[in-house]
Swiss-Prot record:
Entry-linked InterPro entries: AceGlu_kinase-like_sf, AcgluKinase_fam, ArgB, Asp/Glu/Uridylate_kinase
Site (Transition state stabilizer) residue list: K7, K229
Identification of the protein by name: Acetylglutamate kinase
Organism the protein comes from: Anaeromyxobacter dehalogenans (strain 2CP-1 / ATCC BAA-258)
Residues that coordinate or bind substrate: G41, G42, R63, N166
Function: Catalyzes the ATP-dependent phosphorylation of N-acetyl-L-glutamate.
Principal subcellular localization: cytoplasm
Keywords noted in UniProt: Amino-acid biosynthesis, Arginine biosynthesis, ATP-binding, Cytoplasm, Kinase, Nucleotide-binding, Transferase
Amino acid sequence: MKTIVLKLGGEIVHSPELDLVARDLRTLVDGWNRVAIVHGGGPQATALQKRLGLETRMVAGRRFTDEATLEVMKYVVAGRLNVDLCGRLLANGVMPVGLHGASGHAIQATRRPPRVMQGAGPEPVDLGLVGDVVGFNLPLLGDLFERRYVPVLACLGCDDAGQALNINGDTVASQLAGALRADALVLVTSTPGVLRDVKDPSSRIPRITRAEFERLVADGTISGGMIPKLEESFEVLRGGARSVVILGKLAPGDLEAALLEPGSAGTVLVAD
């Protein structure tokens, strides 16, 4: 039996790829594996903000969250996307349970204090109603796993006073994988893994160690937004997870293959 945390980007939730993920998930759950899903909703939140005439303010790649933005995130992430995702999973034979931070305090958080952020200048930045994960309701998740349910967590945390807080989905998934000491954290993205040439899907790198990652950054093969994503992924390995898989542009069976035969699909990150 393995413990798997699956992170789905908002762009995946309404794509045909989700059905491929769901079918592989059913096979994994039928094999008594414990699976938890974390999802974001950035693209959908930005689209709704535009429709409502609200400004989307990004600071060093992070969404500034005021009261109006938090209301959008509640509607989009904890509402529509969570319901739609659970519905698609249910249609494919998976038994999901939709959760967010206020659901049994599933995602416990505190408001992030102002801090200096790379790419945002020397002064501390206040991101507003943004949270840092401080824990999870692991007994609740354990009970769901025992009954072969799949927890589906929207990336909204909640503090002890009941205040909802926006949290980056990759961060929630990474922290959850560490807390569960997961066998694998799988990041399902819009790319088929880490590529030597971003324009050539066939240049996928099957396996990367920490030392190899540092070499690939130094020679420019890995750059831009992929650097912090992989940095955080390697921190997950230090925190107790056994492997991280970056996967996308899925074909039937890719998720199951990536877990059963690491490196056969996507890119697997390992500590050494």
